[in-house]
Amino acid sequence: VGPITRIRKRITKRRRAGHPPVVMFDFDGVVADSFEVFYAEFTTAMRELGFDKLETREDLLKLMEGNAIKGLLRLGFPVWKLRQLSEEFRPRIEAANARVEPFEGMIELLSELAGSHPTYVITSNQTSAVEAFLRKHAVENIIEVIGADKEHSKIKKIRKVRKRHPGHAAWYIGDTKGDMVEANIAGATSVAVAWGWHSVETLQKGRPDHVVYHQDSLRSLFLPNA
């Protein structure tokens, strides 16, 4: 994205600053403390498919600095194996998600926001797995979970939500550099959380509009009188 495009997008964000928010959450690393579970299941699936370029935690975190699917292809993962990867990984991660716990305070915050503003979950996880997690923790009023099985590109997913809510200011909350880059390209105000997968130093490379270090800081962005 060039400097002129970035300036135009930030002007657009400022013009929408007085509008009510439509809030989009990433799932893994923002709501769910899932890195270790995801890492174990993903690397196991990769090894079983004969791909050995994603062995360490650092390898996975590096992959998440951009679009994960494009990153896999750049590493040499065969495009014709993507469907097989999805078929191998989906049941693993759906079963593994039963072991995943939410970050402290995030269930309450998600419920509060969903009761006050249009709220979505936009994730690279599977839609059904995230929906099961939300049901387990009694989170209601999420308009839709849009997972990788519906659309791989977060840019497209964010833009889809923006089109549904033209009178709202779009916000995307994520925990990776890739999340920040995609949110900015899609025209959403990008919020980086410091408790997720990427360090604050890495997150800053994605040019987030906000960095929050605690759930209460996130609450104050959207529920200042709570």
Residue ranges of predicted features:
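Non-catalytic pre-domain segments flanking phosphatase-related domains
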Residues: 1-25, 169
